[in-house]
Amino acid sequence: MRELTLTTTVFQTTKSQEIFAAAQKLMPGGVSSPVRAFKSVGGQPIVFDHVKGAHIWDVDGNQYIDYVGSWGPAIVGHAHPEVIDALHAALEKGTSFGAPCLLENILAEMVIAAVPSVEMVRFVNSGTEACMAVLRLMRAYTQREKVIKFEGCYHGHADMFLVKAGSGVATLGLPDSPGVPKATTAATLTAPYNDLEAVSRLFEQYPNDIAGVILEPVVGNAGFIPPDAGFLEGLRELTKQYGALLVFDEVMTGFRIAYGGAQEKFGVTPDLTTLGKVIGGGLPVGAYGGRAEIMKMVAPAGPVYQAGTLSGNPLAMTAGIKTLEILSRPGSYEHLDRITGKLVQGLLDAAREFGHEVCGGHISGMFGLFFTAGPVTNYEQAKQSDLKKFAAFHRGMLEQGIYLAPSQFEAGFTSLAHTEADIERTIAAARTVLSQL
């Protein structure tokens, strides 16, 4: 096995720059997903070579403590030996069947047992795909067209969701995307996150037209923004009152902030749920599920069509099964909560010591830090952050061997592989950087 050691102590990125320069001639912006291009933090992106545990190495030999975790999936740590061994065994049987396999049943049973709202589940290949499918399903079930989403919440890059969206859309400062027909988004209503009165007004305006409300129960694609007390409960009451569906997009929070996701954490059960990231153990995956009476409308059981060549492929199912097995062991979420709490408090204390206005928080292994006094309870408040200061902080941390998400508008993640030493090293690095900003 490759020896995972620090190969250089001098931060230099010559090879990364060469590879990225070549990539820009081959792919739009040189990347396969916009946020990776470092547009909001400046400089050129780092090109990675290999990963292990809580650490990553780039092509120049620089080593980093990782708080991106492949944008969330690496919750048990990168290249976990049990996951790798399971994948090796699965590879011997083939990479894709395009037909039913037992592994789908096993992962489905695990998801249904864990997530309160899910009685039946359909596997797809990405979170975007899951949200596209669930939108079609909620409209078919209610026979209504309008849907409420929240400013700064991100539900993938499907046309109907690219209205005041988060994630890369927020990072690039785009109000929406060219190429999206107005008719496609005409039925998409928006409200500020954590504003129950705004949602109530929309229902009063369209009492018989709204199919449902979809949201990230904890926002992670406009930075880390938790729900105010009573917000999720209020949405549940409003949707029931008006005969609409409540959909939790738990692509990010599912199995991340609790084994049963945000709905377990907050005790609010939606009608439908979308999942991704963690349930694929680092391989491409998505899923949507909910009440059986609704899910039975999905083809071939019902008339709502959705399909996928690689859906339920054995490699993603294998990685997901093993990842959930590891997560279900005693102490997993206690570890995530402890180390993430220590990390966030250390970052906040360091920033304030050196005179920077910051706010932030965490839930289990999901966290965020804004360069504004706060509080931040919605996307508009998140946009008050000092983006230039964040960019300088990000670059400084990178040079100190700490890899943070290259955008103020993305949540951070810890893993079971992060140690107390990793956290202490990160806080020490932050003190060095913050003292110089």
From Swiss-Prot:
Cofactor or coenzyme needed: pyridoxal 5'-phosphate
Keywords: Chlorophyll biosynthesis, Cytoplasm, Isomerase, Porphyrin biosynthesis, Pyridoxal phosphate
InterPro entries, sorted: 4pyrrol_synth_GluAld_NH2Trfase, Aminotrans_3, Aminotrans_3_PPA_site, PyrdxlP-dep_Trfase, PyrdxlP-dep_Trfase_major, PyrdxlP-dep_Trfase_small
Superkingdom of origin organism: Bacteria
Compartment(s) where it occurs, according to its Swiss-Prot or TrEMBL record: Cytoplasm
GO biological process, one term: protoporphyrinogen IX biosynthetic process
Modified residues (N6-(pyridoxal phosphate)lysine): 277
UniProt keyword annotation of DNA repair present: no
GO MF entries: glutamate-1-semialdehyde 2,1-aminomutase activity; pyridoxal phosphate binding; transaminase activity
E.C. code: 5.4.3.8
Family, per entry: Belongs to the class-III pyridoxal-phosphate-dependent aminotransferase family. HemL subfamily.
Protein name: Glutamate-1-semialdehyde 2,1-aminomutase
